[in-house]
């Protein structure tokens, strides 16, 4: 929608607002991992880059999710403590936002001993994945990501499967959980049986790019990080 608005002459932030029903959807949150990768240990810089990117197409919670993920990934480069990673991500979004409130509700529930089953039931009670707006909104998907990391107990497979099995935007949540988990724990924490089928290939779905080598993308990311 933002691209269409560009063609019509709208620039940010109007490009994110004009006739855009997707402005608080998950689209920005799922494209800002890179800013965390290239800013290890600098969540403020990662969140700033994510904000600049997300503001083109999203507003409010749509932006906050992007900033949260970027900042969390940046912090995951220097610690494997999931709670610290989540709280660092939250430190870079407005504390008066619904996004902050939703994530903190999950974090506090986890700390207070709420079971995994009850946590995910609460998410489904609060948000309806069967509505056109609800299934892809940033907030429910962000808290599914957070809950999966917390209740996954440091197990890669358990964490990503939990994110996918819970519903809503399943592929995006599994990917974000895997991204944060991998940054925090390193590739050695990901069992070989999860890596083998990938065969070092990434299908980008980008016209003119197609399939690329993951290891080559990693090398380019490291080069950018060192600049």
For the regions a language model picked out, list residue spans one by one.
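Catalytic phosphate/nucleotide-handling subdomain of diverse soluble enzymes
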Residues: 58-74, 78, 144-220
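Short sequence/structural elements of tandem HEAT/ARM alpha-solenoid repeats
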Residues: 44-48, 84, 192-196
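Accessory "access/gating" subregions that flank catalytic or transport cores
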Residues: 2-23, 32-43, 51-56, 70-167
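Acidic, carboxylate-rich catalytic segments that either coordinate divalent cations
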Residues: 96-122, 126-135, 184-227
